[in-house]
Amino acid sequence: MFKKRLNKDKINDCYTWEEELPDGSYDMGFHGNLNHMEKGKSGYVTHKQLDKKLEVFKQDLLVELSEKFVTKEEFRAQGKQIKELQIEQKAQGKTLQLILEALQGINKRLDKLESK
């Protein structure tokens, strides 16, 4: 394994040693000229790279609604329109309630006139 690692890192003129210590453990080392060492790709991502990826993802975020793709901004605009429609519907409900009360008042007056 140690020789494989040395070949991978391209170390030339290398001397290795291994010696057993009195406590039963081993001491191992090497000495040589390092011509070229290649750094392997790591699976790690920096915070800056992650932030860039997340920003791109947020900008390209798509939501599928009833077989139509909508961007986040269009989705927010539709949310505002829905809120406005709900407010208008409440106002119409109040107006209808006032009309119903007025008709009930007229109906009571007509009943009084008929009873006389």
From Swiss-Prot:
InterPro entries attached to this UniProt entry: DUF16
Residues annotated as signal peptide: none
Pfam families in the record: DUF16 (PF01519)
Domain of life: Bacteria
Record Gene3D superfamilies: 6.10.250.40
Family: Belongs to the UPF0134 family.
Protein's name in the database: UPF0134 protein MPN_038
Organism field: Mycoplasma pneumoniae (strain ATCC 29342 / M129 / Subtype 1) (Mycoplasmoides pneumoniae)
